[in-house]
């Protein structure tokens, strides 16, 4: 439970909890008996209450084999996505004859907990890209810093700066193209790189760098 909130908190995503239940009008769509389903659904309700989390109930949203707690994330455009999920499965273990040995040395049926924190990597990345609109936080950005040179006279100094950044495990790119510095800056901003470092002859002479963040 805690890992879900920690994981999505790092991504600055607000979560809403949904208790996904059977469709009471169509019990034939689900595996197992009604008693097991009632027990599993009530256990998930208790988990939500114990954690003092507001939740909504969604009949018909359960998997065909189990009820579940779905964590719904809201992206920067206000759209809702199901991300993490916790399922209490009382049906599949029996179908695979899964048992454990209880305290009396006897075989006993088990209940299986399915937990998907992130789900598929591809789906998670699509949600996170939409959420940040490409402007990833510094720690998540594929390129954290981009070095822009004013001319080729400053390349030696620029490479010294790059070496220091790479030694500090900062993901860095180097733009030493024969283009105007204005164009390089505009392209860096369009790429939504957190920090642009601009190096000209003034910076070389002073042994400094000029830093421009994504906000401009």
Regions inferred by a protein language model and the residue ranges of each:
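NTP/phosphate- and nucleic-acid-binding module
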Residues: 1-216
